[in-house]
Amino acid sequence: MNLYNLVRDALRPSYATVSPSVDEPTVDNNFVALSCYATLSVLLYYLQRVKQPYLSMLFHILFCLSQVCMVIWLIFSANFYVSLFAQCMLVVCALGCFLERTILSIKLRSMAPFMSMADNFAIIKTTCNNYVFPVERSSDNLVVLTTSRGIYSNGVFMKGAITVSDNALVVSLFKSHSLLLDRVEHGYDYTVFIYINSVILQNIKPTVSVVNTEFTDVEL
């Protein structure tokens, strides 16, 4: 009897029990990628403003690469409208950057805007020629060093004449202003000219310990 039951159970078709399916939570890969891109872009945007020039250049290159990768990813998107928008955005940005550099080049009469991504440029006149230097961070501080080999401006060297006029013209895309240079040091074969904004040398908020108000303003 037991053998009969075993054979019968073996020949009987077995029906699999279907358990109620539970939907696993899915993560949208596009949302994760866009979140990482936004976080990385904001982080690199502020990191490229560090004072160390090599680190600033490195972060600036990484920031540009991240933007290029995002645009390429959007161009090859499966959505036709997203891809078309990315391609149009790429063309508009390229034309805008080229137009900005071209206008600066015409105003400066120099090809310096195509060699540097600076927003401000200083025109320094010498006895023989005019020299264009990029002003990376601020036009409020400008140091000019002339030697027998050439001229330095904020760390950028160019071969040229020694004698420099007492002013420099700082040109940007929408405005330009003249800076009066002061000769602070003179040696055998070098001269140092410097310009510092008067606001930097002024105590706007005097401390409590200052009693006499005559000493709140500091002049160069």
Curated annotation (Swiss-Prot):
The keyword Membrane applies. It is a multi-pass membrane protein. GO terms for cellular component: host cell membrane; membrane. It is found in: Host membrane. PROSITE patterns: COV_VIROPORIN_3A_CD (PS51967), COV_VIROPORIN_3A_TM (PS51966). Residues 17-116 form the CoV 3a-like viroporin TM domain. Keywords: Host membrane, Membrane, Transmembrane, Transmembrane helix. The chain crosses the membrane at residues 27-47, 56-76, 80-100. Its main location: host cell. Residues 120-200 form the CoV 3a-like viroporin CD domain. This is Non-structural protein 3. It comes from Bat coronavirus HKU9 (BtCoV).
